[in-house]
């Protein structure tokens, strides 16, 4: 069964919009676990416009499910990972001012850098994942780095879903089969929601994990957090 990791960045965005500690990121994350989430994801950025470094430390102390930290692996991020030692680190090639992740790694061009990162994170006992598009050659390069997993960037799937579902998912099916043949685990994330998730999960073989934040938190405004997580888990209970 594919695991659901809830990204709590949007909770931090809401908190920071007003100041103070409402909503409480830690409490929401723990409630997500209690309601059935199988992991918690955060993506701290240098300007701390949502998740703060202090949040990351607080979450590490309290979480009982897998903790996944995403981010651009600059030296500050690497130091944070060394201190926190999450279960998984997802390397994302974000520019500091980007609104949200919008592309995967060109692994061939960044191969030596990613190899060094994977080796470093493995030395600390951390599972690694490289954020990536569906290009098969790029996935082959990712496997050569020694990474444990890739995370497929799913915004193109979500954007094309209502035009032609089969065509939208096909590159991801091929990417998943190829990655699995190379010994890679497969994660996925970006713009997955209650409308498009089941179709994606049903057709994608070997899908280990999805991380979902924006859509899930938006749905929770109407459905409540517990019911929302239940519905997302149902989409993955294949």
Swiss-Prot record:
Active site feature: 43 (proton acceptor), 70 (proton acceptor), 190 (proton donor)
Read off the InterPro entries from this record. Answer: Aldolase_TIM, PyrdxlP_synth_PdxJ, Pyridoxine-5'_phos_synth
Q: Where does 3-amino-2-oxopropyl phosphate bind?
A: 7, 18, 191, 213-214
Q: Which biological pathway?
A: Cofactor biosynthesis; pyridoxine 5'-phosphate biosynthesis; pyridoxine 5'-phosphate from D-erythrose 4-phosphate: step 5/5
User: What CDD domains does the entry give?
Assistant: PNPsynthase (cd00003)
Binding, 1-deoxy-D-xylulose 5-phosphate: 45, 50, 100
Gene Ontology biological process terms, A to Z? pyridoxine biosynthetic process
Question: What are the GO cellular component annotations?
Answer: cytosol
For this UniProt record, the keywords arranged alphabetically read as follows: Cytoplasm, Pyridoxine biosynthesis, Transferase
The feature of type site (Transition state stabilizer) is located at 151
Q: One Pfam family name from the record?
A: PdxJ
- Any GO molecular function: pyridoxine 5'-phosphate synthase activity
Asked if the Swiss-Prot or TrEMBL record annotates the protein with the keyword Kinase, the reply is no
Where is the protein situated, by its record's location annotation? Cytoplasm
Q: Which Gene3D superfamilies match?
A: Aldolase class I (3.20.20.70)
Enzymatic reactions: 3-amino-2-oxopropyl phosphate + 1-deoxy-D-xylulose 5-phosphate = pyridoxine 5'-phosphate + phosphate + 2 H2O + H(+)
How this chain assembles, per its entry, is: Homooctamer; tetramer of dimers.
- NCBIfam families in the cross-refs: pdxJ (TIGR00559), PRK05265.1-3 (NF003625), PRK05265.1-4 (NF003626)
**Family annotation (PANTHER family):** PYRIDOXINE 5'-PHOSPHATE SYNTHASE
Function comment:
Catalyzes the complicated ring closure reaction between the two acyclic compounds 1-deoxy-D-xylulose-5-phosphate (DXP) and 3-amino-2-oxopropyl phosphate (1-amino-acetone-3-phosphate or AAP) to form pyridoxine 5'-phosphate (PNP) and inorganic phosphate.
- This protein is called Pyridoxine 5'-phosphate synthase
User: Per the UniProt entry, what species is this protein from, by scientific name?
Assistant: Porphyromonas gingivalis (strain ATCC BAA-308 / W83)
**GN (gene name):** pdxJ
């Amino acid at each position: 069964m594919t695991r659901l990791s809830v990204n709590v960045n949007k909770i931090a965005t809401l908190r920071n919009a007003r100041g103070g500690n409402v909503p409480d990121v830690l409490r929401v994350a723990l409630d997500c676990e209690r309601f059935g989430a199988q992991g918690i994801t955060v993506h701290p950025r240098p300007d701390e416009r949502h998740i703060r470094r202090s949040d990351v430390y607080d979450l590490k102390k309290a979480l009982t499910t897998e903790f996944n930290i995403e981010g651009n692996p600059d030296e500050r991020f690497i130091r944070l990972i060394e201190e926190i030692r999450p279960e998984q680190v997802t390397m994302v090639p974000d520019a500091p001012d980007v609104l949200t992740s919008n592309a995967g790694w060109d692994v061939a061009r960044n191969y030596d850098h990613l190899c060094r990162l994977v080796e470093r994170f493995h030395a600390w006992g951390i599972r690694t994942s490289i954020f990536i598009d569906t290009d098969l050659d790029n996935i082959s390069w990712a496997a050569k780095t020694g990474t444990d997993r890739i995370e497929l960037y799913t915004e193109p799937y979500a954007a094309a879903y209502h035009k032609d579902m089969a065509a939208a998912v096909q590159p991801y099916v091929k990417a998943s089969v190829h990655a699995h043949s190379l010994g890679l685990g497969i994660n996925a994330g970006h713009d997955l929601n209650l409308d498009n998730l089941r179709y994606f999960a049903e057709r994608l073989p070997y899908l280990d994990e999805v991380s979902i934040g924006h859509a899930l938190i938006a749905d929770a405004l109407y459905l409540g957090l517990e019911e929302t997580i239940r519905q997302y888990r149902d989409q993955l209970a294949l």
